[in-house]
Regions:
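Acidic (Asp/Glu)-rich catalytic clusters
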Residues: 16, 52-53, 90-97, 124-143, ...
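Histidine-centered catalytic micro-motifs
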Residues: 23-29, 140-148
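A short, conserved beta-to-alpha structural element at the edge of catalytic cores
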Residues: 96-118
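C-terminal active-site subregion of NodB/CE4 polysaccharide deacetylases
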Residues: 1-75, 82-85, 153-180, 186-270
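Conserved SAM-binding loop
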Residues: 97, 103, 149, 160, ...
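Short, glycine/acidic-enriched loop or turn micro-motifs at the edges of active sites
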Residues: 81-82, 147
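Surface-exposed cleft-lining segments at the edges of enzyme active sites
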Residues: 111-122, 148-156
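Alpha-helical scaffolding within the catalytic cores
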Residues: 5-11, 85-87, 116-136
């Protein structure tokens, strides 16, 4: 495949093996939302209770990198929506989760105009003040690029800028090192991973299902969609039940992110 293909990704996957466990959420509200990525606060409480009852221990992304324990699990959120400032504190207090939020820094304090769903309903991103507050109560922050564009479609100069600018902005806001990132639209390739490593990232995440052969610079995650129950998430984590169906559904959902890519191209964005 050409490195210009935004959906190109290097395969580090050995099918159906044990792996480091990472969940990825996006929106966390009770409101009606376009798309499949909204999950209500009540339902995430039920899920976190189920994970705890099944012996899972919540750890940070950095702690997971050094773990060799299939019962440790990291909680991540892509896009950094503003409602997380209200939704996360009670979850941190009750379940002692150590979440990481991946933020497209060009949109701090702005609406999600990068997303095709914003045509129907726009959503605000975290403000600088909200990021500062969440960082103070133990939330980690990572990069989701600067402008939420497909990184593999960029030339080397633009790629380096996306990686470094977002990192620098978050470090300036939080006063803490930023060493992790989530690839916009969930895809990467060897050139992007090399650039991420050069920029100082120690871990980076895709939207592919995880596997124990994943590179630290292309780690898969288990996505949680609005229709998921604790049982279906357990199937995804344990590679049981309808796991092949869930894996195929994840691939299809990731492919649908082409809508965002096409909108940005139509609007003349990089």
């Amino acid at each position: 495949m050409s490195s210009d293909n935004i959906f190109e990704t290097d395969s580090f996957i050995k099918e159906d093996s044990a792996c480091r466990n990472v969940l990825v959420f996006h929106k966390l509200t009770d409101s009606v939302s376009f798309g499949s990525t909204n999950y209500s606060p009540k339902r995430i409480c039920q899920l976190l209770e189920s994970l705890t009852d099944n012996g899972y221990q919540f750890v940070s992304v950095s702690e997971l990198m050094n773990a060799n324990d299939s019962r440790k699990i990291a909680i991540t959120f892509d896009d950094g929506y503003a409602h997380l400032a209200a939704a996360l504190p009670p979850l941190i207090d009750r379940f002692k989760i150590k979440p990481t939020i991946f933020v497209p820094t060009s949109y701090v304090g702005k609406n999600n105009s990068w997303d095709y769903s914003s045509i129907f309903k726009s959503e605000p991103h975290l403000s600088r003040q909200q990021i500062e507050y969440l960082s103070e109560i133990g939330v980690d922050f990572g990069s989701h690029g600067h402008r939420h564009v497909g990184l593999s479609s960029l030339d080397n100069k633009a790629l380096d800028s996306e990686l470094s600018e977002s990192k620098n902005i978050l470090e300036e806001i939080t006063g803490k090192p930023v060493e992790s990132m989530s690839f916009p639209v969930g895809k990467t390739n060897s050139r992007v991973m090399a650039a991420a490593q050069k920029a100082g990232y120690k871990s980076s995440f895709t939207m592919s299902f995880p596997d124990n052969s994943d590179s630290n610079l292309a780690m898969g995650r288990v996505p949680v969609y609005f229709f998921d129950s604790p049982d279906t998430v357990m199937q995804k984590l344990g590679h049981t039940g309808l796991y092949p169906f869930h894996k195929a559904l994840c691939r299809s959902a990731t492919a649908l992110s082409v809508g965002t890519v096409l909108l940005n191209k139509f609007l003349g964005r990089p």
